[in-house]
């Protein structure tokens, strides 16, 4: 297992809007904003000194304007690509009660892990 949280968070924060861990979201946050959560972190290949882990993260853009969601989704792609991530899933969801729109994206990468 490899820990990519710090690299991912640093890249997302460079976008310039608030970034939150998905499990700590609460009502009343200012939007647009980004949330993230690790979906999967599994060892796919392992040797004596190194291995590979397949990582999946769910990244959401929250807002009330579809144009904001599209703009920030493209910026997220641009920031995560150099880390080796590619978008493997995407959908949108609207909440009638809050008038919030979510762009829900899944990113995946294969990460090299050095063993001590």
Where are these regions (language model features)?
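Small/polar-rich, solvent-exposed N-terminal microdomains that initiate assembly or binding
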Residues: 1-49, 64, 71-72
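Intrinsically disordered, low-complexity acidic/polar segments
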Residues: 45, 68, 114-116
């Amino acid at each position: 297992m490899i820990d990519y949280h710090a690299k991912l968070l640093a890249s997302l924060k460079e976008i310039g809007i608030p970034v939150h861990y998905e499990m700590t979201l609460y009502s009343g946050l200012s939007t647009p904003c980004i949330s993230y959560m690790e979906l999967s972190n599994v060892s796919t290949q392992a040797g004596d000194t190194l291995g590979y882990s397949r990582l999946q993260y769910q990244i959401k853009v929250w807002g009330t304007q579809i144009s904001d969601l599209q703009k920030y989704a493209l910026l997220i792609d641009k920031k995560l690509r150099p880390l080796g991530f590619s978008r493997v899933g995407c959908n949108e969801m609207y909440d009638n009660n809050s008038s919030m729109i979510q762009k829900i994206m899944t990113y995946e990468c294969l990460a090299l892990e050095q063993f001590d």
